[in-house]
Swiss-Prot record:
Subcellular location: Cytoplasm
Family the UniProt entry places it in: Belongs to the aldo/keto reductase family.
Record-given protein name: Methylglyoxal reductase DkgB
Name of encoding gene: dkgB
Gene Ontology MF: a single term: aldo-keto reductase (NADPH) activity
Provenance organism: Escherichia coli O157:H7
Length: 267
């Protein structure tokens, strides 16, 4: 199954806040939900899905394995725990959230454990997140490019990550963009504002439409119903060549997510 182009992110949302966000999103027509073990909200997401009444087969659920669970003896048990919290027998996509710091657990070990989880039916697809080109090479060597559904990376108008994108594309690895709106910084951009005015759209719609137009999946989060609804309409917005050129010129390698002790050496 192809990764949906548009989904709901849940980073930094917990308890009642995430329950409300997920239920509202599902009510509005969202069907892809992105969570992670470290977000500490899988149980709340599971509850929201259960209460929404949306049938499981209509949903595309992604979770991510945290670094403490990367070893072959921990990965599958940790995923089973995630499934329990999410109240489901399987997830659609499981990602390695970050590569193991200092290569404590080798890429080969955790990718093969993840592939085993797929073979056991715990996850339909597997993938990676925050992987550089050398790390993608190792992941491909471990399980084959055909088994890597996506690389979820920070990607916004200010960090277009072109080297990683080009390399992934060349090897048939889809890109999912997180932090697409650059923590909201890009919403205040004059170039984006001009494009938004031209299309009678919001700045968020312009940025999300740009990313989807480039072929990336996006997973914006929001706690406000009007923003959830408005963001969804980005799927109907078509930018022209002039717009795309203007956004391409905003790239300035402005990376916002690079946790010390966790981040690899970026490309």
């Amino acid at each position: 199954m192809a990764i949906p182009a548009f989904g709901l992110g849940t980073f930094r949302l917990k308890d009642d806040v995430v329950i409300s966000s997920v239920k509202t999103a599902l009510e509005l027509g969202y069907r892809a939900i992105d969570t992670a073990q470290i977000y500490d909200n899988e149980a709340a997401v599971g509850l929201a899905i259960a209460e929404s009444g949306v049938p499981r087969h209509e949903l595309y659920i992604t979770t991510k394995i945290w670094i403490e669970n990367l070893s072959k003896d921990k990965l599958i048990p940790s995923l089973k725990e995630s499934l329990q919290k999410l109240r489901t027998d399987y997830v659609d996509l499981t990602l390695i959230h970050w590569p193991s710091p200092n290569d404590e657990v080798s890429v080969e070990e955790f990718m093969q454990a993840l592939l085993e989880a797929k073979k056991e039916g715990l996850t339909r697809e597997i993938g990676i997140s925050n992987f550089t080109i050398p790390l993608m090479e190792k992941a491909i060597a471990a399980v084959g490019a055909e088994n890597i559904a996506t690389n979820q990376i920070e990607l916004s108008p200010y960090l277009q990550n072109r080297k990683v994108v080009a390399w992934a594309k060349q090897h048939g690895i889809h890109i999912t963009s997180y932090m697409t709106l650059a923590y909201g910084k890009a919403l205040k951009d004059e170039v984006i504002a001009r494009i938004a005015a031209k299309h009678n759209a919001t700045p968020a719609q312009v940025i999300l439409a740009w990313a989807m137009g480039e072929g990336y999946s996006v997973i914006p989060s929001s706690t406000k119903r009007e923003n959830l609804e408005s963001n969804l309409k980005a799927q109907n917005l078509q930018l022209d060549a002039e717009d795309k050129k203007a956004i391409a010129a905003l790239d300035c390698n402005d990376r916002l997510v690079s946790p010390e002790g966790l981040a690899p050496e970026w490309d």
